Amino acid sequence: MSAAISRNWPAPAKLNLFLHINGRRTDGYHELQTLFQFIDYCDMLDFKVTDSSELILHSNMAGVVADSDNLILRAAKSLQQMTSFKGGAEIWLDKRLPMGGGLGGGSSDAATTLVALNTLWNTQLSTAELAKIGLKLGADIPVFIHGFAAFAEGIGERLQVVSPPEPWYLVIAPDAHVSTAEVFQDPLLPRNTPKLAIDTLMSQAWINDCQKLVVSKYPQVAKALGWLLEYAPSRMTGTGACVFGEFTQQQQALAALAKLPSDMQGFVAKGMNISPLITRLNHP
């Protein structure tokens, strides 16, 4: 008898509420201080456990390649190898988040895959063990696995749970693909922001050290940010291209969205300090 499909596992987007670059390490990675918060805008994944060890991925979006390099498949394969689980899975991805926009969609998909399959395969790894697997696949995967808004240091792997305000956001996804690698390799990127204590960082104005460089190189990002700043305090998330504005009320964000120029794409979402993935995990 075939296993039932376990449905509606969310892979939420994240925002970097601030992003400071403190220096460059000898291995080429950058020392960061950043604040991660989730939003209730998610990719959705369904899983079916199979007797075969094969891993099969389906997606609603062209360009999400179902090959061995896909982060979802790499995450599932890593969990198989770590636990010696003999079965496999068929996975369906409903891709809703913009790709390569600084919202962490690929990392979130991988994290949800690890959390869901650890439950469905009954492999019983701890959250810390799952995060260790995730870190080998991407520096920001652990924050999605832990599922709490967090202040992050190092290359983003040292996490401290925090509870920033949970406003409404209008997120705009400019029609531009910003290469994270190119941003971090650019000689004009600021790399000397002083490290500060978390209490100091939480109480001062929040900025993104990548924003000025990206805005100067990508006119689509500059246009979106300039438009959004007319309505709310706004900045870029990650290395872009997505930008977000903060609103205290949902109707304020929706009113701004209604005025969005036709050549821009956007959505309204709520800030969340507890990931929808944690809620799904606790209510199977």
Curated annotation (Swiss-Prot):
Ligand binding (ATP): P98, M99, G100, G101, G102, L103, G104, G105, G106, S107, S108
Entries under InterPro entries matching the protein: GHMP_kinase_C_dom (IPR013750), GHMP_kinase_C_sf (IPR036554), GHMP_kinase_N_dom (IPR006204), IspE (IPR004424), Ribosomal_Su5_D2-typ_SF (IPR020568), Ribsml_uS5_D2-typ_fold_subgr (IPR014721)
Keywords tagged on the record: ATP-binding, Isoprene biosynthesis, Kinase, Nucleotide-binding, Transferase
Pathway: Isoprenoid biosynthesis; isopentenyl diphosphate biosynthesis via DXP pathway; isopentenyl diphosphate from 1-deoxy-D-xylulose 5-phosphate: step 3/6
EC category: transferase
Enzyme Commission number, as recorded: 2.7.1.148
Catalytic activity line of the entry: 4-CDP-2-C-methyl-D-erythritol + ATP = 4-CDP-2-C-methyl-D-erythritol 2-phosphate + ADP + H(+)
Annotated Gene3D superfamilies: 3.30.230.10, GHMP kinase, C-terminal domain (3.30.70.890)
A Gene Ontology biological process term: isopentenyl diphosphate biosynthetic process, methylerythritol 4-phosphate pathway
Any GO MF annotation of the entry: 4-(cytidine 5'-diphospho)-2-C-methyl-D-erythritol kinase activity
Residues annotated as the enzyme's active site: K14, D140
Domain of life of the source: Bacteria
This protein's record includes keyword ATP-binding: yes
Family in the record: Belongs to the GHMP kinase family. IspE subfamily.
Task performed by this protein: Catalyzes the phosphorylation of the position 2 hydroxy group of 4-diphosphocytidyl-2C-methyl-D-erythritol.
Protein name: 4-diphosphocytidyl-2-C-methyl-D-erythritol kinase
